[in-house]
């Protein structure tokens, strides 16, 4: 049973998936920091000095009555809040992550299309007399025994060997 688990765990797909999850988590952390620490502060300044992480609505006051200066104060007082500013931060983070994944998938699909675009040369051709498929290098059709046009001289093939 341990051997079967080892084979399963070391399969390419499982290892690739694990690496993808780890890298995805790290990328998510970077995007969240980018949004909360780099993008939202200037956006807050443009909208009149608003800190989006402190945008909330008090649904029920806590032990100490409001108004509360910040979300942290409302939480410390035990107030029930609707934190729409944090939701806006998460929405911006999601949009950036989704767009990044879209660009990545689009690039991978383009690479796959290039690989699929180069088809292998045909291995068979059609006899013009009886329309039977014959090997590309055949000089005569096996069905109707007609000599095929464009075929190499059979004697030349033997002499070349």
Curated annotation (Swiss-Prot):
InterPro entries: Mechanosensitive_channel_CS, MS_channel, MSC/AndL, MscL_channel. It is a multi-pass membrane protein. It is found in: Cell inner membrane. The chain crosses the membrane at residues 14-34, 85-105. SUPFAM superfamilies: Gated mechanosensitive channel. Keywords: Cell inner membrane, Cell membrane, Ion channel, Ion transport, Membrane, Transmembrane, Transmembrane helix, Transport. Pfam families: MscL. Gene3D superfamilies: Large-conductance mechanosensitive channel, MscL, domain 1. One of its GO terms (cellular component) is plasma membrane. It comes from the Bacteria. The keyword S-adenosyl-L-methionine does not apply. GO terms for molecular function: mechanosensitive monoatomic ion channel activity. The keyword Magnesium does not apply. HAMAP family: MscL. NCBIfam families: mscL (TIGR00220), PRK00567.1-4 (NF001843). Belongs to the MscL family. Homopentamer. Channel that opens in response to stretch forces in the membrane lipid bilayer. May participate in the regulation of osmotic pressure changes within the cell. This is Large-conductance mechanosensitive channel. It comes from Chlorobium luteolum (strain DSM 273 / BCRC 81028 / 2530) (Pelodictyon luteolum). The lineage of its organism: Bacteria, Pseudomonadati, Chlorobiota, Chlorobiia, Chlorobiales.
């Amino acid at each position: 049973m341990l051997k079967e688990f080892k084979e399963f765990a070391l399969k390419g797909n499982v290892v690739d998936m694990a690496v993808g999850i780890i890298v995805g988590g790290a990328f998510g952390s970077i995007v969240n920091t980018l949004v909360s620490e780099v993008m939202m502060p200037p956006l807050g300044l443009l909208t009149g000095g608003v800190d989006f992480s402190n945008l909330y609505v008090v649904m029920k006051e806590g032990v100490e009555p409001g108004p509360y200066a910040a979300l942290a104060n409302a939480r410390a007082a035990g107030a029930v809040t609707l934190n729409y500013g944090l939701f806006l931060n998460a929405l911006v983070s999601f949009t950036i992550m989704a767009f990044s994944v879209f660009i990545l998938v689009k690039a991978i699909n383009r690479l796959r299309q290039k690989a699929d675009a180069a088809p292998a040369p045909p291995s068979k051709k059609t006899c013009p007399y009886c329309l039977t498929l014959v090997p590309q290098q055949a000089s005569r059709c096996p069905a109707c025994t007609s000599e095929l046009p464009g075929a190499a001289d059979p004697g030349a093939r033997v002499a070349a060997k």
